[in-house]
Amino acid sequence: MSVREDIKIMGASALMFRKGKYVTEKDLDIIIDIFTKMKFYSSGIDKEKLSKGESFSISFTNDHWRRRWDDDDYQWDSLDDNDHIIIYFYPNVEINYGEYIPSMGETVPDFLYFEDISGRGRLLLEFLHRYFKLFPEDVFMEEYFYTKDDIDKLYAKLPWNELWAYEDPKTF
């Protein structure tokens, strides 16, 4: 088993970066709207924390996940990971927690954290394709950095590779 396969089994997180601009409540609303248009429902939104500049998590689920969860014969391993995801939104980012982003030429803090992206390749690819149409300068990172161009190339290449987030975008 390769290291990448181990991560797929164990779980991995991913980050989103933005250069030079602080994220706002409007940015969060746009992110929620993207998931909503993908037929996901959000829970855990705490606008009071946002107004205080505190970070918080939001859980997104779709109808299929909800139906399985509410089923009397519910089995945890029967759920498709592409049916749910948790993100953490950081409205007041600090540069000392940043990453050097080559395409941006500087160290930039992350403002969005995707918890356990393992098995969520389709969900993330669809989300990022829509997201980068609105924020083309941002950068997504798991192990490698992905720009809008990288995601566009990957999105156009069918069938989608479920493990794309663990591969060097130069190989697309």
Which role fits each region the language model picked out?
Residues S2-R18, K37, Y41, R122-F172:
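Acidic, proline/glycine-rich low-complexity IDRs
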Residues M16-Y22, Y113-S118:
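Short beta-strand-to-loop capping motifs
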Residues G20-V23, H64, V93, R120:
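Residues that cap or initiate secondary-structure elements
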Residues K21-I32, R122-L124:
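Short, conserved charged micro-motifs
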Residues V23-D27, L50-K52, Y146-D150:
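General structural signal for secondary-structure boundaries
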Residues K37-F114:
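Short, intrinsically disordered low-complexity segments
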Residues S103-K133:
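A mid-sequence interfacial segment
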